[in-house]
């Protein structure tokens, strides 16, 4: 059995670790609430832009934006991979990276090369180790996603698709469900399908009569770019909310495990102390009997 001094040292070390994980749990809980608020605040904008784009598309069926046209025959696909910059968030990054790797392999089996955009340091490191072609990246977003930081990296993918150099663009991220559950999502961002413009709100699929300045094509072009950017921003906001939730849960589990270890070490310490006292008493009794 280890000595009492050694056990006391272990107890002190685990107690210090538990203080750190407990503090990180509280910080993550605070950041999680703010991240959820940002995530929910971003949804109405994306929904409104989608609704307007749907009405305008029905009002101008003769015009097809490049985002709505499939680039058949192109042997290169795009992938926007959203991960975190930091670790200590459970299996959140591992799950999305594993799913992305599977998607890479599926595309390669179909004869497609992949050009990737990394949002987040963990994804960038993975893509570099994997040997993927990274055409744009953005890292160190902090706790608040800013669209102006994302636009440059995302625009690289959008421009390549508009020029007919990509067959499709996929978006991989972690969707926030609730505090205890997050889902890995890989969805097709481009070309935009009719599903993107389904209202699903019970309203009839009518066309509104708009007055365009300068013209319908220019408005639709700008609107669809804004819509796709909003989808990416929403994915980043969902990923950040998922990150803080996963980190809070992971740090709580670490704190609980530390508490269990401390209890076990305390029990071991008490046994060692009891054995030492018993030994001393035995020696005293033995000495008295000898006299």
Swiss-Prot record:
Cellular component terms per the entry's GO annotation: plasma membrane; proton-transporting ATP synthase complex
Its membrane topology: Peripheral membrane protein
TM regions (residue ranges): none
One BP term from GO: proton motive force-driven plasma membrane ATP synthesis
Keyword Oxidoreductase among UniProt keywords: no
Subcellular location: Cell inner membrane
GO molecular function: ATP binding; proton-transporting ATP synthase activity, rotational mechanism
Domain of life: Bacteria
Key words, A-Z: ATP synthesis, Cell inner membrane, Cell membrane, CF(1), Hydrogen ion transport, Ion transport, Membrane, Transport
Subunit (UniProt): F-type ATPases have 2 components, CF(1) - the catalytic core - and CF(0) - the membrane proton channel. CF(1) has five subunits: alpha(3), beta(3), gamma(1), delta(1), epsilon(1). CF(0) has three main subunits: a, b and c.
PANTHER family for the chain: ATP SYNTHASE GAMMA CHAIN (PTHR11693), ATP SYNTHASE SUBUNIT GAMMA, MITOCHONDRIAL (PTHR11693:SF22)
Family indicated by similarity: Belongs to the ATPase gamma chain family.
NCBIfam families: ATPsyn_F1gamma (TIGR01146), PRK05621.1-1 (NF004144)
Role: Produces ATP from ADP in the presence of a proton gradient across the membrane. The gamma chain is believed to be important in regulating ATPase activity and the flow of protons through the CF(0) complex.
Protein name: ATP synthase gamma chain
């Amino acid at each position: 059995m280890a000595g009492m001094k050694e056990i006391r040292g272990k107890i002190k070390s685990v107690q210090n670790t538990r203080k750190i994980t407990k503090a990180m749990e509280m910080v993550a809980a605070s950041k999680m609430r703010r991240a959820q608020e940002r995530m929910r605040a971003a949804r109405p904008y994306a929904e409104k832009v989608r609704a307007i784009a749907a009405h305008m598309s029905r009002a101008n069926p003769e015009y097809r934006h490049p985002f709505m046209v499939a680039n058949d025959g192109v042997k290169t696909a795009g992938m926007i991979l959203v991960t975190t910059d930091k670790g200590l968030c459970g299996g959140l990054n591992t799950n999305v990276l594993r799913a992305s790797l599977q998607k890479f392999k599926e595309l390669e089996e179909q004869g497609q090369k992949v050009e990737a955009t990394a949002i987040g340091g963990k994804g960038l490191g993975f893509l570099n180790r994997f040997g993927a072609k990274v055409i744009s990246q953005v890292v160190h977003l902090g706790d608040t996603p800013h669209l102006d930081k994302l636009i440059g990296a995302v625009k690289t993918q959008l421009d390549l698709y508009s020029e007919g150099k990509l067959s499709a663009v996929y978006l991989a991220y972690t969707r926030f469900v609730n505090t205890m559950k997050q889902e890995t999502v890989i969805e097709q961002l481009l070309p935009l399908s009719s599903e993107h413009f389904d209202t699903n709100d019970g309203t009839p699929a009518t066309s509104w009569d708009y007055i365009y300045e300068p013209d319908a094509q220019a408005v639709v072009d700008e609107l669809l770019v804004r819509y796709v950017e909003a989808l990416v921003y929403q994915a980043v906001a969902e990923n950040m909310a998922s990150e803080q939730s996963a980190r809070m849960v992971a740090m709580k589990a670490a704190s609980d495990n530390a508490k269990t270890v401390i209890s076990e070490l305390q029990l071991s310490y008490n046994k060692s102390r009891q054995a030492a006292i018993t030994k001393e008493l035995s020696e005293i009794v033995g000495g008295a009997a000898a006299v």
